[in-house]
Amino acid sequence: MAMDGAAIAKGAEGSVYLSTYLGRDAVTKVRTPKGYRVPELDRRIRTQRIRSEARLIREARAAGIRTPIIYDVDTVECSITMERVKGVTVKRYLDEHPEEAERICRLIGTNIARLHNSKICHGDLTTSNMILTPAGELCIIDFSMGASLIGVEDMGVDLRLLERGFTSAHPDIKDAYGYITEAYCREKTGAQEVLDKVQEIKDRGRYT
């Protein structure tokens, strides 16, 4: 694996670099060391989290979700090297093609339902963490905030955060969340319980 220079994305937990792996275009995500932690503890935490993220990506893929193919997990460098997915973020696509909102939102709802049916939550469902490929597939990326073996509360939080993020990123797209939940209900076992939990979260004011 060889990285190609400056980071293309930076977050609180890590940075993403363009790279190559055995001649294939790739991206490498490196977990950032935290100077305020004891070095041994910091390495242990970063190693656990990089392994967890890789496992979630693989589990999501096994559940029928389009995710990047993982090429390598380096527990020394605390990095994941994975497929460089071709396409554009859903955020950019909807900004440029708002007339496609209903179709894309239904695609989002179906894929989230498949995640939740497999007891996986993403933890940061935004249209910036979804890529629309040239083949029309929805690829979900960045599972760094995700978890598995989840309950209804986690699923409700996933949907609530998506609703808030969608409203903020795409305020001019009407009925978006409705399209998402309609598709979600068709695919998700026990969907109404999750939607009831979303309403409960709203009523509690927990994420408002």
Where are these predicted regions, by residue range?
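Catalytic-loop of the protein kinase fold
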Residues: 117-127
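ATP-binding glycine-rich loop module of kinase domains
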Residues: 4-51
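C-lobe/activation-segment region of protein kinase-like
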Residues: 139-208
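Conserved hydrophobic alpha-helix
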Residues: 60, 111-115
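Regulatory N- and C-terminal appendages and interdomain linkers associated
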Residues: 1-10, 23, 95, 99, ...
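Conserved structural core of kinase catalytic domains
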Residues: 46-50, 61, 65-108
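Conserved protein kinase catalytic/activation segment
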Residues: 129-140
